[in-house]
């Protein structure tokens, strides 16, 4: 559009307003001018860049401060690597009287330096820093490059079309893969290729017109002809609309990702209307283009940060291991400075807990009681006690986020080793050799709840009070986990396969913490058994304690029906119906009178809205207040005879005295089923095969 009308005051209002240049200093061609639209855009980009840099710096400071607060003397001040930190005492000594240095606590054991945390190496941090620098360069270019030079349109096209990368690359961080470097790299390459194509075609189109800028005319920032601009904005609008529609039907983007899509859709919609009006030679076209460009530039930084996360979410590269770093102080205070050490490549051990470490040659192994992709579970005798040893092949822990494979193993060990409750599976020790990692737990003779419901459900039918005992035991264990401080520990895979029973079937314990996490801000991964997943988890929303409550409701339903929640449906179909059609498995008819209150509790637990579900504190109070008065329950015969245990060990040349397990009152349970996180975020079942 010809802008010469500005000088003779024959433009329409919008054209005049957004093409007008206000002289700030000087005269003639050397005067410093302020263009209403372009310079406002430049200031907007600079504002967005400064905002992002400020929030990044604030996040880094927050990380430094929180690290020093956790590891310093409680005063929040930073300390040098040689300073002595206080752990559960004021004199900097642990309970064993061993001084612990900050260097030992963080750098040596976890490879994380307080001065150079992993946040700096995370893809998300690099992306945000890249966008802020790009916006700053674009703003300074528009503000200070002389608009009457031939370099001005070329540089503006090159930098301006870079929004193809900055606008779309962010979407890779919004679909639940966290710091997935492969996905980020792939998306960056795709966006860069598209950027090069559009940038080259735009430059060719501009220079083919042989149009030279006169005075400040190039500062209108309209180097594309109206038809090209309309085509690009309409195409972008259609693509973003399709993607948004796909996220509504199948939520592969986090809810915050839709905010960014709506922002891009709004900008392209207004810009396309402006381009269309310019084609029709309507003055209002410049109003649409100018308003869209200015709002876009000023809101870009704040909205990008709001979409991707807040200060705490910037720690997402370390977020999965924050419980380990927090609880590491407790390990060291209990077992001394040298109790945990991480070895280099090729070393014989990846983790050593001095009080928990057990060598494989200390076991007398019996039969395999569970197996799967990640390894196997074997019954064993250790120091006269029957235990379960989960033997894990080290290469089964490789993951896609670039972290060391030992971290996944370390995570479960860390969670297990700090839990102490009668209704949570007891951790006894850890083994680590060149190619094998092992976790030692108490042996549970009753097997899994899943196997009981499959093979011996008649025991529950004959003794209805058993269902109450199991529900109360599980609720106590889950209340203990959810009441963990400072943040609740979410199980995320609560199912009948992960509830283990004693030989009398009167005590149930929560097991398998391979997928557990301390609650954070971005827990959106879809994990666990599909049949037990809460609707909000299936569609990709935040994982909260109420998701475990939903799983508990289905678990109790399984106890009183003896069936799996999906019944004849495929697990994926069951999860889809529960999420989108509010389907729940039917309650048994008629229901045992002793189970009527359990039925009411089930319906409370599996409500669609997480806010309407009770907490485990309420659940436990409800169960204990409504447990029916019944005749004394007579436990069934032991599931596994002592002689069979001894014979299994004899077959492995490990002779045991018959009846030796009679004296093992401390450890009489079996670790029968396991689910560990496999590559890509799925889970692999360990099927109970012990007779």
Curated annotation (Swiss-Prot):
Extracellular side: 1-33, 145-153, 208-227, 280-284
PANTHER family on file: SERINE/THREONINE-PROTEIN KINASE TNNI3K-RELATED
InterPro entries: Kinase-like_dom_sf, Prot_kinase_dom, Protein_kinase_ATP_BS, Ser-Thr/Tyr_kinase_cat_dom, Ser/Thr_Kinases-Pseudokinases, Tyr_kinase_AS
CDD domains from the UniProt entry: STKc_MAP3K-like (cd13999)
Protein name as annotated: Seven transmembrane domain-containing tyrosine-protein kinase 1
GO process terms (BP): signal transduction
Recorded GO CC terms: cytoplasm; membrane
Protein localization: Membrane
Keyword Transferase appears in the UniProt entry: yes
Family: Belongs to the protein kinase superfamily. TKL Tyr protein kinase family.
The keyword Amino-acid biosynthesis is assigned to this record: no
Xref: PROSITE patterns: PROTEIN_KINASE_ATP, PROTEIN_KINASE_DOM, PROTEIN_KINASE_TYR
Broad class of where this protein is predominantly found: membrane
EC number: 2.7.10.1
